[in-house]
């Protein structure tokens, strides 16, 4: 379990992880690390929340919220944001399914991807700022949001097919079991409830339903999921959870 956690931490974040704790794992061990995704999110969100909390007395709510969101983006290396941008460039291109997938593989940022990044990042800054004004603890809110965002991404992995022939997403999509999916989501919901009580539970359940709907819509549009759509689900899951706290 410890090795799985550090494998997941090195896979979906930019935090330094000792090689002896994350390397030399079999493919199956990486796949089993899905159950630790909410714990990785918990850590990343707690760090970002701490940044916002520490800066608030010094620079005020708006800038504290901005730097908290910036910290989260830096901690992940923009990994999930890149997936969000690529997904939006593809699905809003109004092309054939194959062409959409081609566009998503293109590393260049398009108009729809740029707009998606602006909207999501601005929305996160605004909602984190509003939560600070409402005296909702930023460490608890961001830790829970990141845990739930990563936990609910399992909905796009279980019983979905990989829309391409190869890629990083193929490590998880269609490869995790029902038990792993349920454990991952249950852990995310439990963490949100422990941190924020019934408010966290309600927000987690709302996020679950909406991310399930997102997965269904992406499956209809693309014929399956990719690593990019997983990144999009994580980013949107975080935002939806934070909005549901308001």
Curated annotation (Swiss-Prot):
Q: Which Pfam families match?
A: CobS
What is the reaction catalyzed? alpha-ribazole + adenosylcob(III)inamide-GDP = adenosylcob(III)alamin + GMP + H(+); alpha-ribazole 5'-phosphate + adenosylcob(III)inamide-GDP = adenosylcob(III)alamin 5'-phosphate + GMP + H(+)
Major place of residence: membrane
- GO BP: any one term: cobalamin biosynthetic process
Top-level taxon: Bacteria
The annotated topology with respect to the bilayer is: Multi-pass membrane protein
Q: Name one GO molecular function term.
A: adenosylcobinamide-GDP ribazoletransferase activity
Q: Which cofactor does it need?
A: Mg(2+)
Q: Please state the pathway this protein functions in, per its UniProt record.
A: Cofactor biosynthesis; adenosylcobalamin biosynthesis; adenosylcobalamin from cob(II)yrinate a,c-diamide: step 7/7
- The membrane-spanning stretches of this chain are 34-54, 59-79, 113-133, 136-156, 181-201, 203-223
Whether ATP-binding counts among this entry's keywords is no
InterPro entries in UniProt: CobS (IPR003805)
Question: Which GO cellular component term is one of those annotated?
Answer: plasma membrane
Keyword annotations for this protein, in alphabetical order, are: Cell inner membrane, Cell membrane, Cobalamin biosynthesis, Magnesium, Membrane, Transferase, Transmembrane, Transmembrane helix
Q: Please tell me whether the keyword Transmembrane helix is annotated for this protein.
A: yes
- Where does the UniProt annotation locate this protein? Cell inner membrane
- For this protein, the Enzyme Commission number is 2.7.8.26
Q: Which family does it belong to?
A: Belongs to the CobS family.
Question: What is the recorded function of this protein according to its Swiss-Prot or TrEMBL entry?
Answer: Joins adenosylcobinamide-GDP and alpha-ribazole to generate adenosylcobalamin (Ado-cobalamin). Also synthesizes adenosylcobalamin 5'-phosphate from adenosylcobinamide-GDP and alpha-ribazole 5'-phosphate.
Protein name, as recorded: Adenosylcobinamide-GDP ribazoletransferase
Source organism of this protein record:
Klebsiella pneumoniae subsp. pneumoniae (strain ATCC 700721 / MGH 78578)
Source lineage: Bacteria, Pseudomonadati, Pseudomonadota, Gammaproteobacteria, Enterobacterales
**Which gene codes for it?**
cobS
